[in-house]
């Protein structure tokens, strides 16, 4: 089955699939077919000879990545069996576990198990408050990085916050572990501080589904991974289900202002 089988050349999905712009934004509500258009775009690129390892579909869940590959296989798209769609967290753990990256970051990307959090909380000194206060401090530390508050003008940590971060990171380094909320920030810092890193030029095409559900750090990681790539983002600017995970729906609304010559498609 060719990528354009049963696809109306006048349809939005067709226009998205053939768009050769460097930056593409697709805004559509739920159930309008935006993920279908993304699938056809991936199929068109693979059929056009783009190597599967130069193309990165980013999905919000692992199940969505598996669904995309299964549908492409059912279409008989050449090379789709080599395609590796991924969530950003999964990709982040893969990158951070590479030896050359570990040598730079000094952080082991082994996410702490839940039972390991108890000794962490116990080992943090009482000067940071009771157990509940220490838990809140850890959440605030993760939230600040998810929102990239450290990058905002005027943001300044108190002396106690700085001391807390130092003790927290020292503990994590010693125990060769990482908080789940540190994966993306560590990936962000690595990519930002190492613009010549091989990961920055790994992909020629990035395709990102449910962009509005990514937090600010995740959206910035997409920019860094796509420094030399064509980037297509897909999402609904009116619906974000993950505000409790610090989703940044404003990112899709202002994408045309933060990126040059954006090609817009709307359902």
Could you say what each language-model-derived stretch is?
Residues 1-32, 36-37, 54-56, 123-207, ...:
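Accessory N-terminal region flanking or inserted into the helicase ATPase core
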Residues 1-104:
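P-loop NTPase Walker
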Residues 19-21, 88, 107-119, 134-140:
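Conserved ATP-dependent motor core of P-loop NTPases, especially the RecA-like helicase ATPase domain
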Residues 40-47, 70-74, 185, 189-192, ...:
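Short, well-ordered alpha-helices that flank and scaffold nucleotide-derived cofactor binding pockets
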Residues 50-54, 75-83, 99-112, 123-134, ...:
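Short, polar/flexible loop-turn hinges at active-site or ligand-entry regions and domain interfaces
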Residues 69-71, 97, 111, 219-220, ...:
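Short amphipathic alpha-helical segments
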Residues 210:
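Catalytic glutamate of the conserved HExxH
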Residues 219-267:
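Conserved RecA-like helicase ATPase core segment
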